[in-house]
Amino acid sequence: MKIAWIGTGVMGASMAGHLQAAGHELTVYNRTKSKADALLAGGATWADTPAEAAEGTEVIFTIVGYPTDVDQVFLGHDGILNAAACGAIAVDCTTSSPALAEKIAAAGEAKGIAVLDAPVSGGDVGAKNAALSFMVGGDAEAFEKVKPLFEIMGKTVVLQGGAGAGQHTKMVNQTLIASGMIGLCEAMLYAEKSGLDPLTVLQSVGGGAAASWGLANLWPRMINDDFEPGFFVEHFIKDMGIALDEAKRMNLELPGLELAMKLYTKTAELGYGRKGTQALLLALREINKG
């Protein structure tokens, strides 16, 4: 299948690599070309714009940074919807605004292009291991057509509803993670301060009621002072901002999410915005120096 892939960062490069390894023909675009080097070395074709990437392909995947990027990639002068063929399917895996997902889906429908919102969970580890969870919103027929592609990249693929439903589900996911990360990093700080060995602590708590993806994957990184990004702090702040905006629109108060937003904003202010979400530990250490 001819596939366009737009966005070859921490997540996108691995995801696209699985499709390439499965024998699909890729055309790729990324703002920084060097981040697509591995895919190009594997036989992918380079495109200079999202529109050029989309032209003549059957399916277009995108995973970029911010809603403004999504808007530009789809609706801009050199955007996907100005070049994709009628009957093509576009899939946005960026965590973005539900309202924007609905807007782009409607614009695509007017041109005969089905657009699915399909944000993912699982981080860099899930992307590398083809173990991502896809939360999908959009047309059911289009979903069934591209489901085999999702299954190459992930282990859980669920259609949640119409356009925007995938993004709403991702907001649920990020709300769960937000409070969980506070607990994870505070627990590490407590273990350190009390003189415990965090590794043996993990052996005790990792199989009980406190078990979680973060505990299994991020606790060992923190033990090794590895704060490199599986998911950037600055992108998590973006996600929480979207969730809080949606909550406000629905007249919801989410104090746990608001606290996480405050703490992660502090983390970014301390210079850790391009570190992984586990860098909240560094901010908590700073807070406790006072």
Stretches found by the model and what they are:
Residues 130, 134-137, 158, 162-194, ...:
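Active-site-proximal catalytic alpha-helix in oxidoreductases
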Residues 167, 211-275:
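Interdomain hinge/lid region at the active-site interface
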Residues 1-62, 88, 93-94, 124:
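NAD(P)+-binding Rossmann beta1-loop-alpha1 motif at the extreme N-terminus of oxidoreductases
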Residues 32, 66, 139:
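Residues in the short beta-alpha loop(s) of Rossmann-like NAD(P)-binding domains
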Residues 270-290:
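NAD(P)-dependent dehydrogenase/reductase Rossmann-like domain
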Residues 50-54, 59-60, 67-132:
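Rossmann-like NAD(P)(H) cofactor-binding subdomain of soluble oxidoreductases
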Residues 96-175:
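Rossmann-fold dinucleotide-binding core
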